[in-house]
Amino acid sequence: MYAQSEKNKGEVKQKKMEACLEAANIYASFATKEGMLPRPPYIAIGLFACELYMKALLMKRDPKGCYAHTHNLLDLFQALPALDQQKIEEACENHFSEKPLLDFLAENAEGFEKWRYDFETKEMTISHFAFLALINALRDHCKN
């Protein structure tokens, strides 16, 4: 085995990040499609898009392109640099009138897994406006 050059490592990191963003954009566009009702499949896919957006940001910010291997939205958000957290919170601010973003993330930390298996639980709720605001804030922040 040979050592990768720094240039090759950078190219691999960039390709992984771009693939992650592409997947997030596909899932987000499906989950936020006009006229869609907030049903479990759309919510699960939207929360997965949020996860991928945060992982793409973590890859972008980390010199080695590393990210946390978890579905936990709160853990991923807290792993982001403070400036990224601040910008995302500011973008969501007007849509989180009932509770702060961190509370929403804590309540939906394992949302992707829970909403995939919604038939196993009795009752699940999510603020549709907050859900859409988070997806849009993350998508917009990843463009910068």
Short names for language-model regions:
Residues 1-28, 32-33, 62-144:
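Long, charged low-complexity segments
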